[in-house]
């Protein structure tokens, strides 16, 4: 099975303890853990700072599954949950795959921290997750809400800790097994 994981810094495996964009080691990143646990070919197309793009990513023709988790950076940069959901809907309708080949994951809600100075952003992340679920249902796309996975976030209130990556991988494997 050929899997593409498309997302932001939490997909990339960004280590917030680093100022230079370093990554956690492969034994800690959820994308790498997914590959090890399944034996699948899993490509990490995470990018630090990625917002929801206007156009579909270029996917290899042998892509069996696209795991997509985006929206955090849109909210951090002032977009409303509704604006982010509209951008996400546009993106999802551009992806040249069948609906059952896409897994949309709502990012875990942010917490107060160095990058999250107020409750409004946290509230927006909860509302965005609800919008993602509604959107997935409307488009017939499989959905998972990482907000229910108890993902540990770092001091910045945004990025997964190594424990958060392991928990994310564990819960994602459960979703993929169903």
PLM region spans:
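Serine-esterase "nucleophile elbow" of acetyl-processing enzymes
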Residues: 1-46, 56-62, 166
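Alpha-helical cap/lid subdomain in secreted, periplasmic
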Residues: 56-178
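Acidic carboxylate-rich catalytic motifs and surrounding loops in phosphoryl-/glycosyl-chemistry enzymes
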Residues: 44-52, 143-148
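Short histidine/acidic/glycine/proline-rich micro-motifs that form metal-
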Residues: 11, 20-21, 49, 73-76, ...
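Residue-level signal for threonine
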Residues: 29, 51, 161
């Amino acid at each position: 099975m050929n899997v593409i994981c498309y997302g932001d810094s939490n997909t990339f495996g960004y280590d917030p303890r680093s100022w230079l964009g370093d990554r956690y080691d492969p034994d800690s990143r959820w994308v790498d853990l997914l590959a090890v646990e399944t034996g699948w070919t899993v490509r990490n197309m995470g990018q630090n700072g990625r917002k929801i793009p206007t156009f579909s990513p270029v996917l290899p023709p042998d892509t069996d599954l696209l795991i997509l988790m985006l929206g955090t950076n849109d909210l951090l940069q002032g977009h409303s949950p509704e604006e982010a959901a509209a951008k996400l809907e546009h993106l999802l309708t551009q992806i040249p795959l069948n609906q059952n080949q896409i897994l949309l994951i709502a990012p875990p809600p942010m917490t107060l921290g160095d990058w999250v100075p107020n409750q409004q952003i946290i509230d927006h992340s909860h509302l965005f997750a609800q919008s993602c679920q509604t959107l997935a249902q409307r488009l017939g796309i499989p959905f998972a809400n990482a907000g229910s996975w108890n993902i540990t976030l770092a001091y910045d209130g945004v990025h997964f800790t190594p424990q958060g990556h392991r928990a994310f991988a564990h819960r994602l494997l459960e979703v993929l097994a169903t």
